Structure formats: C-alpha cells, structure tokens
C-alpha cells in the first residue's frame, strides 16, 4: 500500500534534503513547494502574506493530484511544510481521502542550528528563496511542534 510522507521542520532544518532521501528510499514521487512557487510566481513572493496567497493556490491544484497518485499506488513525499496545525490537517486529509497511511517526518532542530544553516544556504545562493533573519523569526513564531494527538504517525529526525 502506498504511503504519504510529510515533512515538518523549521526553515533550513533539512526538509528538502530529507525529502530527496525519502523519495529514493521509497521509490516515491517527490513534490516540493519551493520550486513550484519559484516557477509559478517569479518575483511575486515578497512577504509572508504573498507566500500564503500563492501557496494556497498551489495546494488547490496539488491536493487532487496527490490523492490520485496515492490511489494509483504511488508513494508520495510532499516537501511542503507541515509546520502548523492547519497545514497538517490539510496534509493528513490527503492521506485520508486516498485511504492510505502517512508518516510525518519531524526534523527537530533548535533555532540556532537552523539559522546557521539558513545563513550558509543563503551564502551559496542555490535555494529558490533566501529568507532573512527577520523572516526566519516571523515564520518560526508560527511553528507548532507536531503531536500524535493530531492523529499523526510521527518519525523524529535529529540531525
């Protein structure tokens, strides 16, 4: 039976790197939010409000695609941040709609480690988006640690 793999972690915690690993390990289709946003909305995402508006549009199209892939027997790794209760409810709903199991991979790293990785990532210039320290702080304030009480199967990663 196919599985939906979800990712939860602060900015620069390693979600996309883990998504690539999981995709290879599970012969899964990997769908990543950042490249979609960068390609569909070049130069339009200048604030968190812009991100939320554009991300919501993508999710409206992506949801049925993910459910269809899962129903067709394809493992899926969604490199979309499952960092808030609302996001996790939407993502979990995709697995439920397809009638398949899920696994939420939680990258548990402290803010200092993530911020250092963000600075290194920004210096290399290879990521679709370069968050500032202020954006990191703003987005991190909304981060909510996942809980099994949400109906989630959680695998914790600490590196």
Report each predicted region and the residues it spans.
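Hydrophobic anchor at the beta1->P-loop junction of P-loop NTPases
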Residues: 7
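Conserved substrate/cofactor phosphate-moiety recognition/catalytic segment
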Residues: 13-74, 120
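A glycine- and Lys/Arg-enriched "phosphate-lid" helix/loop adjacent to the NTP-binding pocket
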Residues: 45, 96-144
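Glycine-rich phosphate-binding loop used to anchor ATP phosphates in small-molecule kinases
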Residues: 53-102
């Amino acid at each position: 039976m196919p599985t939906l793999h979800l990712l939860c972690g602060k900015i620069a915690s390693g979600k996309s790197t883990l998504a690539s690993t999981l995709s290879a390990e599970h012969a899964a289709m990997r769908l990543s939010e950042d490249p979609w946003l960068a390609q569909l909305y070049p130069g339009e995402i200048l604030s968190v409000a812009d991100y939320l508006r554009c991300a919501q549009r993508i999710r409206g199209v992506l949801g049925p695609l993910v459910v269809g892939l899962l129903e067709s027997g394809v493992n899926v790794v969604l490199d979309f941040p499952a960092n808030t209760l609302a996001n996790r409810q939407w993502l979990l709903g995709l697995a439920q709609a397809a009638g398949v199991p899920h696994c939420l991979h939680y990258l548990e790293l402290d803010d200092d480690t993530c911020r250092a990785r963000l600075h290194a990532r920004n210096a290399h210039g290879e990521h679709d988006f370069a968050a500032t320290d202020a954006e990191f702080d703003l987005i991190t304030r909304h981060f909510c640690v996942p809980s099994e009480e949400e109906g989630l199967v959680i695998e914790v990663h600490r590196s």
